[in-house]
Amino acid sequence: MLQETHLRTNDLYRLKVKGWKQFFPANRQEKKARVAISISHKIDFQRRNIRREPEGHFIILKGRIHQEDINIVNIYAPNMGAPRYIKKILEDFKKDIDSNTIIVGEFNTPLSIMERSSKQNINKDIVSLKNTLDEMDFTDILRGFFIPKKQNTHSFQGYMYHFQR
């Protein structure tokens, strides 16, 4: 998953030469930062449907990998109002989210205590977003399995969620 990409046409050619044959940008404007999903040629992926936001803040890719349906969502939340933005996306696409959904991205929101400085407050929008994620039964794969304790993660607020039923 790529965040804040500024890829030009010749950059896409270089990606394809290096084995990233399937590339799905959220928008086509070269000047704007956008998110994208790139899939290796080694993976048998068949695209079914793709939904993009015109500003390039998110992309939802539906397809099949080895005869298994999968949804991949890449979100780049704006700096202001990020919790409400993410919550709205999740609620708008709630019917499309199933047990084979992976959500990745830059949420620009400290959802975990490990990502906050001691002076940072948790506001009601963050609490509401966390409640929505809990209600939808998401698992934070990155924090749950790969970063077990508070580390110097600087300002990294990327997330990877997997929906389980």
Can you name each region flagged by the protein language model?
Residues M1-R165:
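A shared catalytic/ligand-binding motif for oxyanion handling
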